């Protein structure tokens, strides 16, 4: 399987500060990569560098073999869809209007949305199962619904790579599950090639649930890259997070979870 996204010996930072270096990994079309690591480990800065919001300090980012260095913003927007953490918002757009903004790279900032743009937005809303929210006020929907709408906006861009910054942060358990299920479906595709997905989280269980690969960042370096089972081990969690955990298989399918040893002792 050929690489859709390739990161080669990447160094990244901002201002005068180098945050990370020597980072390399590949992700194929239809694969989900989970980015794990402690606070301050460089995840957000790495994302900004992948997206071209910060220039790389060294190394390369390639999409389908093409070096993205020097790409203009419009070309980047056609390759990368970005889903930030869902904030409360400030303007009373409808959900449909918010999703239509994802079509800007296809039409220009000052052009009216075309019939094709509206169709793409409607298709994204329906694919995420939120077509019923189309006329709702963006400021009056729940955090989980806003997160789904942001994913729909990125999907309307028709990107090749979807980047999500902690997509389940501040969501309740049910909405976390629904968002993760949708992310996995987008990678799997609907009768065709799925998206390449890169998402960050602080919850190793989410990597076990939906990721094909895990990149574990620690101190700006790639501590380990591989399958969730290869990366998320008791030894690596101790080394990177300074926490004793037990990685156990649960349920009929044997999905793995991390159990903090200290908390288990407190609970008897």
What positions do the PLM features span?
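Conserved ABC transporter NBD signature motif
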Residues: 59-67
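Catalytic Walker B motif of ABC-type/P-loop ATPase nucleotide-binding domains
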Residues: 162-166
């Amino acid at each position: 399987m050929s690489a859709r996204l390739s990161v080669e010996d990447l160094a990244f930072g901002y201002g005068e500060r180098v945050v990370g270096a020597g980072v390399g990994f590949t992700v194929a079309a239809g694969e989900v990569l989970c980015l794990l690591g402690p606070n301050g480990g460089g995840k957000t800065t790495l994302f900004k560098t992948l997206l071209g919001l910060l220039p790389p300090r060294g190394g390369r980012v390639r999409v389908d073999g093409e070096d993205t260095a020097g790409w203009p913003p419009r070309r980047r927007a056609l390759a990368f869809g970005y889903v930030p953490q869902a904030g409360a918002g400030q303007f009373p757009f409808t959900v449909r209007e918010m999703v239509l903004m994802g079509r800007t790279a296809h039409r220009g900032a000052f052009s009216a949305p075309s019939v094709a743009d509206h169709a793409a937005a409607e298709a994204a809303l329906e694919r995420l199962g939120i077509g019923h929210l189309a006329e709702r006020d963006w400021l009056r929907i729940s955090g989980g619904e806003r997160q789904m709408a942001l994913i729909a906006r990125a999907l309307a861009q028709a990107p090749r790579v979807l980047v999500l910054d902690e997509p389940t942060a501040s969501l309740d358990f049910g909405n976390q599950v629904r968002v993760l299920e949708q992310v996995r479906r987008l990678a799997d595709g609907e009768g065709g090639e799925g998206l390449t997905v890169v998402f960050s989280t602080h919850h190793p269980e989410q990597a076990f649930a939906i990721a094909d690969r895990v990149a574990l960042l620690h101190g700006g370096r790639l501590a380990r890259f591989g399958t969730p089972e290869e990366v998320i081990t008791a030894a690596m969690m101790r080394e990177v997070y300074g926490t004793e955990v037990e990685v156990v298989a649960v349920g009929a399918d044997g999905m793995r979870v991390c159990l903090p040893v200290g908390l288990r002792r407190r609970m008897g």
